[in-house]
Amino acid sequence: EWEHKIRHDPQFVEALSKRGIDNPDLVIIDPWPISNFGEESEKGKRLAIGRCWLRREETDNGYARPIEGLSPILDLNKSEIMEIQDFGVVPIPPNDGNYAARYQSDFRTDIKPIEITQPEGPSFEVQGNHVKWQKWQMRIGYTPREGLVIHTVGYEDQDRLRPIIYRAALSEMVVPYGDPTNDHYKKQVFDSGEVGIGKCANSLELGCDCLGEIYYFDVALHDIRGNALNMQNVICMHEEDFGILWKHSDNRIGETETRRSRRLVVSTIATVGNYEYGFFWYFYQDGNIDYEVKLTGILNSAAVPPGVTPKNGTLVAPQVVAHNHQHYFNVRVDMMIDGLKNSVYEVDTVTDPISENNMHGNAFSTKKTLIKNERDAPRTIDPFAARTWTVNNQSSTNYMGEPVGYKIAPGENVLPFHHDNAVIMKRAAFMTGHLWVTAYN
C-alpha cells in the first residue's frame, strides 16, 4: 500500500522524472523506521523513511540500482506522506547485478551430490512444541517481535531432569550505518523492536534451507490489519553430524577409541528488506549449547557519482557503495542452573607473580569475580585475559564438590565505532557492553 501511494505521489513522480525515470512502477521502496533525533517535526509521531531503488524490469534485482538522494518521509500514524526529500540528482548506477538462476547462462558442473539419509528416522521426539533429544528436553516457541524462542531447557541426568535455561531468545537487534551524507545518518533500524523480526519469517524449503530428516514447526502470526496468519515451515529442526566428539589412541596397546559428535539444530530465517538473517540454536551431546546468527542476502546499497571513491563505505559495483555498518544482536537468556539460585562470575586468566611458589615464572591461574549487581555491568570481552563468565548455583555441587555451572564463552566481537555523542549510542546503549547481568524480578 505504501509503495503504491508513494510511486504515484505527484512530487515523487516529478523527482523521478528529473532522474530520467518515467515508469514509477519499476521503483521499489523499503520503508525504514526513522531514528528519533529530537527534531520538532518528529515529536509524537511514528515516522519512516522510504529507501528507493530502480528495476529495469519487474523481476530484476531490486537492490542493484539505488536512487540516491530521494527519500519520502512517511507518517505511519496518519498513513500520510509527510514530505518528499530531494538532495539532488545522482546518476543511476548502470549494472543490473542479477543473481537469479533465470539470468545465468550456465552453472558449475564440478560438484557432486551429498546425500544425507537417516533410514530409521531422526533421534528426536516431538509432542506439540515439546522436544526430546539425546537427554535434552525443551519447548519451542515463537513471537512476532523476537522470532524463535527456546523455553525450559533441561538435561536428563540419570533419573532426573536438571533445568538449565528457563527462556532464551533474541531480545533486540540494531543495524546502525556509518555514512553521514544526505539522510544516510538516519539508517539505524531496530529490526526486532521496530520492525518485528518474527513477522519477517521465511517458510523454509527442504533441500535448500534445511537438509536431511527435517521436522518443521508452523507459527501463528497476524497480518498488518490484525487478521490471523498461519505460516508453515517457519522453524526447522534436524540433526547434523559434527565431526569428532572425542578420540584417544593408546599407542602402547595399539587401540584407538573414537566417538562421533552429533548436534540438534533449531533454526529460523527472516528477510528484512535486503538482508536475510538465519538464527540457529545448537545443542550438543556433551552438554554444550551454541547460538549463531548467519547473515546473508544483499548489502544495503547507495549510489555515488562516477569516479567518486567513498570514505565511509566500499564500492561493490560501478557507482554503487555499501556503507560501513555494524549488526548488533542482543540475546536475553534467563538461566536456571539446577534451580533459581544462580550467580554470575567473571573469570580472567592471570599471570602469577614470581615468588617462592613460582620461581620460574611459568605459572598462571584464573581469577573469579562475582558480579554482585546491575551496576557491575556492562562487561566487555577481553581476549588477552581469555575472559569468560560462569553462571553457578552455589547450592548444588557436582561430583567433585564444586558448584555446578555453565560457562558463557564469547565469540568474535567488537564495540561500537560511533562517536560517544552519536544518537545511536543513546538509543541502543546495550551496544556498549558484551554482557549485561540483572536479577530477575
Where are these regions (language model features)?
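A short hydrophobic beta-strand element
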Residues: 41-54, 264-268
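Extended effector regions of multi-domain proteins
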Residues: 1, 17, 55-148, 152-288, ...
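Short, non-transmembrane alpha-helical segments in secretory-pathway proteins
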Residues: 1-38
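Short, structured motif recognition centered on aromatic/hydrophobic residues
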Residues: 2-10, 46-52, 72
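Short, charged low-complexity intrinsically disordered segments located at boundaries
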Residues: 34-48, 360-364
